[in-house]
Amino acid sequence: MAKSATIITFLFAALVLFAAFEAPTMVEAQKLCEKPSGTWSGVCGNSNACKNQCINLEGAKHGSCNYVFPAHKCICYVPC
């Protein structure tokens, strides 16, 4: 019993050391530019609906309702 506990402890320690030295992969962030939605009409009050419309209809990466004088508008975020 003591031998199996020692083996399990050793394997756990080896796993922790391996995970600690594993280098995370860095990916260069893609810059996004703001663009007013071309398909949204009216005041934007639902950021989730705006996001879905930007992604599905305009091919954007993201979308949200932002205040642009004089009202909230749906803004899509596209690669620059």
Swiss-Prot record:
This is Defensin-like protein 17. InterPro entries: Defensin_plant, Scorpion_toxin-like, Scorpion_toxin-like_sf. Residues 1-29 form the signal peptide. The gene is PDF1.2C. CDD domains: Knot1 (cd00107). It is found in: Secreted. Disulfide bonds join C33-C80, C44-C65, C50-C74, C54-C76. The modification Pyrrolidone carboxylic acid is found at Q30. Pfam families: Gamma-thionin. Belongs to the DEFL family.
